[in-house]
Amino acid sequence: MSLFRDDGIVLRTQKLGEADRIITLLTRGHGRVRAVARGVRRTKSKFGARLEPFSHVDVQFFSKGSELVGRGLPLCTQSETIAPYGGGIVTDYARYTAGTAMLETAERFTDHEGEPAVQQYLLLVGALRTLARGEHAPTLVLDAFLLRSLAVNGYAPTFGDCAKCGMPGPNRFFSVGSGGSVCVDCRVPGSVVPSPQALELLGALLTGDWGTADAAEPRYVREGSGLVSAYLHWHLERGLRSLRYVEK
């Protein structure tokens, strides 16, 4: 029997019995973790209020084995709020739908429980903080998070040089299956011809150039979001259910 403590973002919850919940978190030190929180569905449970989606929490776990993950679900025995990001997200539809897509993405990219995914964790914390504060348009924050999540998981798209032969950009065509921008010689059936402005926007979101991103016209934001969605769908093999509700 062992105790573990870690910081985490609550990704989702599901009912268990009459008063309990299974809490899924993305933690700093242990990656994705599922744990049972007892009694949190009772009306007066302050413990349960701290374990809602979007919450950034400091959590203590009790495990029957010497490892946090592997021998049944651990118990979540204590929780302290680090940052209640949900308060700045759930009251606004655009922020809420963007945030929900972020949580689903983070869970999809951490499909092996107990494996540390520090970069993905830090990306999620930063994106939710930015979203909750309303620093940029929710769609831009979401697309930046999706692109960077793809990058830290080894699927970084290119928006200039050819993804196949390396020909210096800008290149006219874009292929999700080829890895992004491609030259005329490397284009494949199904390649599209995005506007230069949309590609510039996506490059800015990937690198954190918010001045360029915030100045983008709505039509290029919509076009860029379509490319991000298609690229993500290709690499995840199936799309995110939550993306269909995101306002573009």
From Swiss-Prot:
Highest taxon of the lineage: Bacteria
Gene Ontology CC terms, in alphabetical order: bacterial nucleoid
UniProt-listed InterPro entries: ARFGAP/RecO (IPR037278), DNA_rep/recomb_RecO_N (IPR022572), NA-bd_OB-fold (IPR012340), RecO (IPR003717), RecO_C (IPR042242)
Gene3D superfamilies, per database record: Nucleic acid-binding proteins (2.40.50.140), Recombination protein O, C-terminal domain (1.20.1440.120)
Pfam families the record matches: RecO_C, RecO_N
Alphabetical keyword list: DNA damage, DNA recombination, DNA repair
Gene Ontology terms describing biological process: DNA recombination; double-strand break repair
SUPFAM superfamilies: ArfGap/RecO-like zinc finger, Nucleic acid-binding proteins
Protein family: Belongs to the RecO family.
Its biological purpose: Involved in DNA repair and RecF pathway recombination.
Protein name in the entry: DNA repair protein RecO
Lineage of origin: Bacteria, Bacillati, Actinomycetota, Actinomycetes, Kitasatosporales
